[in-house]
A protein has these predicted regions:
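Non-heme di-metal
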Residues: 1-117
């Protein structure tokens, strides 16, 4: 994996997605195969499960890439609820505020609000 290479956010996400793809499609399946051949069925199962997680990472990174390429990071087609990750200010609209009206942090601090409780 390339170390010490810092590109743009888009380039970094593309590289990360490619790395995750290699991990879930080649590396971990190979590790699982070797473990199985050596009689370590539990370890082989663990590697297969890790492969599943790595595939999810690739999907997430590719979704982030698409958001950047289609200018959908801080703008959505329909109204959504945006939340400032610094202070918690909530805004409803198609775009996140350029600056948080509560704490004055820049737009980069906004994300689509999630309720995972």
């Amino acid at each position: 994996y390339p170390a010490g290479v810092i590109g743009t956010t888009l380039e970094n996400l593309q590289a990360a997605a490619a790395g995750e793809h290699e991990e879930w499609s080649a590396d971990y399946p190979k590790f699982a195969q070797i473990a199985q051949e050596e009689g370590f069925a539990d370890i082989a199962a663990m590697y297969r499960n890790i492969s599943n997680a790595e595939k999810g990472h690739e999907e997430r990174y590719r979704a982030f890439v698409k958001n950047i390429e289609t200018a959908q990071v801080f703008a959505k087609e329909g109204e959504v609820v945006w939340q400032c990750r610094n202070c918690g200010y909530i805004h409803t609209g198609k775009t996140a505020p350029k600056v948080c009206p509560a704490c004055l942090h820049p737009q980069a601090h906004f994300e689509v609000m999630k309720k995972n409780w």
